[in-house]
Amino acid sequence: MEVRKALTCVFLTVFLCSGDAQDSVTDSVLNCCEGDVLFLLDSSGSVASYEFSRMVDFLSELLLPFSLGPDHVRVGLLQVGTEPHLEFGFDAYSSQQGLQAALERTKQLKGDTNTVEALLMARAQVLRVGVPGGARPDLPRVLVWLTDGVDPGNVQEPMARLRDEGVAVLVVSTGHGNYQVLREVVSPPTEEHLFFVDIDDISIIGEDLRNSIIEIIRAERLQVKSVSSTSAQLEWRPVLSGSGSGYYDIKFGPMRTGQIPGVPGGASTDPGSFQRITRPADSSSAQLTGLRPDTTYTVTLTPKNNQQVLNTLQTSFTTQTVNPPEPQIQLLSSLSVSESSSNSVRVSWAPLLPRLIQEYQLEYSALPSGPLRVLRVSNTHNSTVITDLQPDTQYLLTVSAKQTSGKERAMTVKVCTQEVLPALSDLQLSSVGDETVQLRWKGSFDGLRGYWVTWERGHSQRSTLYLPPNRLSTTLNHVPSRARVCVSPVYRTARGEGLCCTA
């Protein structure tokens, strides 16, 4: 039987607003970004038609707020099947109308889940800089992989090559996929780039996923980094480097009393507080020195060029104190779930602080309205096994670290138990002609979604066929003698244990 590990779904509180999504986002979001985003969509036979339709609808909603085009965001869609299929590349659509129509026309490929071949195509033809139809130079590149988690293959190596080449990798899994594998392939931080969600609830991660993409491709023109008590590093995207002339005029000073950060108003004009520096056209950074500790500064950067008028950019930052306060101890900083079965899960948390914590309290209930259960754990333990759970059920779990003073720190997750997967009980194979066999089996289990048939067609070749749950027989052609033929039941989250015969 294929063993599937349980997935931990981060509990999200989402506020949904009615109305036109395009009208509900501000201009700062619409024009926030520049970058190339490729979506790798699992379109194989392991994905039910309903699930595929939900994934495409999710992409439509996810991408609707973005401005598209050569000066904004470009989007590509690569489908995973027996052979990868580039539905459309980065140059295909520069308007939401065209993109949305293309998504509506997208059809499922079915066939095998050949994710590795699709990744090789993505790296060689789509995400590579400088090739026709490829990514743009000097801009962020993002790969978002949407998968049901069934048989992804050995994706770690091709994903690692993409990350080494500067591609940010994000993953959305709608099934009980291998958490360890998916955690390895995403770009850090994992908590912002790896999403587990049931297909019926996929819309709840839309805002978080969009924000994660925006964080990577945001066209931040003016950024302040490496801030100390007396200095800061100013960085910007060079807009004069191609002109060969001009310079950057930089002004900075303490913010005026009553001035709101981020609102134009210029630096303070108090005597001795105003500073000005310039940098040549090919510059993209400047060091700001002579700053006062624990002070909020406003800085403006104006590109000067006789050939064109360019916008003045402004930002603000606060220098560090001379003796910054010691960071507070996190009583509870991480929470994870592992070793899931159909009726139990292991819950682990960190850090373990027996000198500060009196006890840990676990509260959990089945969603949406199951009875609340409470489990208390000693302050010397950082994990426990919760038993007597219902199979294929989502639970809302809260772990609280309680101090003797009465203060506490709590974290909440969604826990998903495994589905019970009955095995196939009978399989009969009979020959009905030259290289033609007929299969019959017994099925009709609760929760059955269909049957997965595989057979050998020659040396190192294998064919697959997905059948609906009401089919209990099929005829296969081109099955050589002594070929191995297998049938497995398919459930919502995984395949059950199948049976095999030899032709």
Swiss-Prot record:
Subcellular location: Secreted, Extracellular space, Extracellular matrix, Basement membrane
The entry's keywords: Basement membrane, Disulfide bond, Extracellular matrix, Phosphoprotein, Repeat, Secreted, Signal
Keyword Signal assigned: yes
Cited InterPro entries: ECM_Assembly_Org, FN3_dom, FN3_sf, Ig-like_fold, VWF_A, vWFA_dom_sf
GO cellular component, one term: extracellular region
Predominant location: secreted
Coiled-coil segments on the chain, per record: none
Tree of life domain: Eukaryota
GO biological process: axonogenesis; neural crest cell development; regulation of cartilage condensation; regulation of cartilage development; synaptic assembly at neuromuscular junction
Record carries keyword Lipoprotein: no
Phenotype on disruption: Mutants primary motor neurons have reduced axonal branching innervating the muscle fibers and secondary motor neurons have aberrant axonal structure. Mutants skeletal muscle show also an abnormal structure with disorganized myofibers and reduced synaptic formation at the neuromuscular junction. They show a progressive impairment of locomotor behavior and have smaller jaws and abnormal cartilage patterning compared to controls.
Domain (Fibronectin type-III): residue spans on this chain: 218-324, 331-423
Signal sequence range: 1-21
Residue ranges constituting the VWFA domain according to the UniProt record: 36-213
Known partners and oligomeric status: Homodimer or homomultimer; disulfide-linked.
Stated role: Promotes matrix assembly. Involved in the organization of skeletal muscles and in the formation of neuromuscular junctions.
Protein name as it appears in the record: von Willebrand factor A domain-containing protein 1
Species in which this protein is naturally found: Danio rerio (Zebrafish)
